[in-house]
A protein has these predicted regions:
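Short, small-residue-biased leader/transition segments that mark boundaries at the very start
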Residues: 2-4
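Short glycine-/polar-rich loops that comprise or flank the Walker A/P-loop
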Residues: 8-13
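Conserved small helical "lid"/interfacial subdomain of P-loop NTPases
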Residues: 17-44
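Winged-helix-like regulatory helical subdomains adjacent to P-loop NTPase cores
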Residues: 42, 54, 60-137
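Short amphipathic alpha-helical interaction segments
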Residues: 133-150
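A short, conserved structural fragment
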Residues: 148-158
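Minor-groove-contacting beta-hairpin "wing" of winged helix-turn-helix DNA-binding domains
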Residues: 159-166
């Protein structure tokens, strides 16, 4: 099944890409755009960098789509509308390539657990997740374990979990 394929791929030997500091993302965007003759403001660079949260795949998507938006206008000057459109397209691509496949094959209760986690802005105490679900901590622990085993969430400290998949919290909030 698709769940087992995703689990196999996650367990395969991989190179772990950590989040990139936002100042480095901003500098990389500036260097890339400007070295290619594109004009982009410091404010636009900051907006583009901040929205990526340093996630490597999102960096790639945002940069590509901002560039593409300006290119579609046949312009070498990035305007705010290019940044906005680029960010929107990057989110759509990330949702389709990462978030939607991640949720496929999960049970209704697995998803309910994730939606309860998404109510927090950061790591969620497991007791709060259970309360949001309207379930006992022991009941919710079954789904916590399944999601941990599937690498969808991670334990940040004892009794606390967070999303292991970047931007999944935001996707769930937009699509509840």
């Amino acid at each position: 099944s698709d769940v087992y394929k995703r689990q196999f791929l996650r367990r395969a030997k991989t190179n772990i890409l950590t989040d990139i500091p936002l100042d480095e993302v901003r500098d990389a965007f500036a260097t890339t755009f400007r070295a290619s003759g594109m004009s982009i403001t410091d404010a636009q660079l900051s907006t583009a960098a901040n929205v990526t949260a340093g996630y490597p795949y999102m960096i790639q998507l945002v940069g590509y789509h901002i560039w593409d938006a300006a290119d579609m206008r046949d312009s070498d000057t990035i305007i705010d509308a290019d940044v906005t459109a680029g960010i929107e397209e990057a989110r759509i691509d990330l949702d389709n390539a990462v978030c939607i496949p991640e949720l496929q094959g999960l049970s209704k209760n697995d998803r309910e657990y994730l939606e309860a986690m998404a109510a927090s802005d950061g790591p969620s105490p497991t007791v709060n997740v259970a309360q949001r679900m309207g379930k006992t901590p022991n009941y919710a622990a079954t789904y916590r374990k399944r999601l941990l085993d599937a690498f969808v969430i991670r334990e940040t400290e004892r009794g606390e979990v967070d999303f292991a998949v970047p931007f999944l919290r935001e996707y769930l909030r937009r699509n509840q």
